Amino acid sequence: MPAVAPSAAESRHSNTFLRLKKKLERGVGEAIADYNMIGDGDTVMVCVSGGKDSYTLLSCLLALRERAPVDFRIVAMNLDQKQPGFPDDVLPAYFESIGVEYRIVTEDTYSIVKDKIPEGKTTCSLCSRLRRGIIYRTAKEIGATRIALGHHRDDMLETLFLNMFFGGKIKAMPPKLVSDDGQHVVIRPLAYCTENDIERFARGMDFPIIPCNLCGSQENAQRKQIKTMLQGWARDYPGRIESLATSLRNVVPSHLSDSALFDFVGLTRDTRVGEGDTVFDPPELPAAAAPITLRRADDDGDRSAT
């Protein structure tokens, strides 16, 4: 007889899954500690879209709160954008089943986006702006001192390369930021967690995933190209993605070219800069470092640049 796949409940009790759960919670805990994301008395509004990332974020924060050295409140928040076919009963039922305080906000941003954006064009930018305004307003209404978003390590790296390749900037997603009006602190506790681990965890937990019909099938072509590139590197060159992620926390402004970050104009022979002379030294690389190969996302041939 063919083997029967274990149920979600059975897999949640396997040693493999428990190790994965511990790994994710440890990553979230380290990010919170490293960036002082949550303190005693904070109210954390966790934005839950119904996707794997936000479900995982909520699960990890609830688990960590049980043993955290500080006391903080968690409020799950979902924005119902009135997308056709959106199952508005799924998230309330889930929140109640796990006993978390929650707020469902209903705003028909779907109609606004469809009215303003021509058919076939990417809706992400306008949708994001509308959603951000509603999230900030809701955070103020419930007294949230922190707004937690479900972006993970791979999102941050994709954004870094998007800005470098298409925007001419070295800019990614910060793990913690203050809104432009200074009223809200936004945190990304999954900053150290990988998408692969999150996907495995979400499958094991059997979260009631809700697809986004507005944008889920029209993934930005540029982001898709970057994602494909990073996935290829992860597959072909083990350790490269981890090194890239580490580089986001090891920036040396004096070895870049931005005068807003380092005073090159005022630099003289009397100026002492850490790592100054190392510019002449070869970088310390593993003995068998693999060459970096870039291919066009639509290129199935051998054309490459190393």
Swiss-Prot record:
| CDD domains associated with the record | TtcA-like
Question: Which molecular function terms from Gene Ontology are attached?
Answer: 4 iron, 4 sulfur cluster binding; ATP binding; magnesium ion binding; sulfurtransferase activity; tRNA binding
Q: Which reaction does it catalyse?
A: cytidine(32) in tRNA + S-sulfanyl-L-cysteinyl-[cysteine desulfurase] + AH2 + ATP = 2-thiocytidine(32) in tRNA + L-cysteinyl-[cysteine desulfurase] + A + AMP + diphosphate + H(+)
Please classify the protein's predominant subcellular localization into one broad category: cytoplasm
The name this protein carries in UniProt is: tRNA-cytidine(32) 2-sulfurtransferase
Cite a single GO BP annotation: tRNA thio-modification
Coiled-coil annotation: which residues?
Answer: none
Q: What else is known?
A: The thiolation reaction likely consists of two steps: a first activation step by ATP to form an adenylated intermediate of the target base of tRNA, and a second nucleophilic substitution step of the sulfur (S) atom supplied by the hydrosulfide attached to the Fe-S cluster.
Where is the motif named PP-loop motif mapped on this chain?
A: 49-54
Q: Which gene encodes it?
A: ttcA
Function, please?
Answer: Catalyzes the ATP-dependent 2-thiolation of cytidine in position 32 of tRNA, to form 2-thiocytidine (s(2)C32). The sulfur atoms are provided by the cysteine/cysteine desulfurase (IscS) system.
InterPro entries named in the record:
Rossmann-like_a/b/a_fold (IPR014729), TilS/TtcA_N (IPR011063), tRNA_Cyd_32_2_STrfase (IPR012089)
Provide the cofactor list for this protein: Mg(2+); [4Fe-4S] cluster
Name the UniProt key words of this record, in alphabetical order: 4Fe-4S, ATP-binding, Cytoplasm, Iron, Iron-sulfur, Magnesium, Metal-binding, Nucleotide-binding, RNA-binding, Transferase, tRNA processing, tRNA-binding
Q: Establish whether keyword Transferase is in the entry.
A: yes
Localization, UniProt: Cytoplasm
Q: Which domain of life is it from?
A: Bacteria
**Family to which the UniProt record says this protein belongs:** Belongs to the TtcA family.
Its cellular-component GO annotations read: cytoplasm
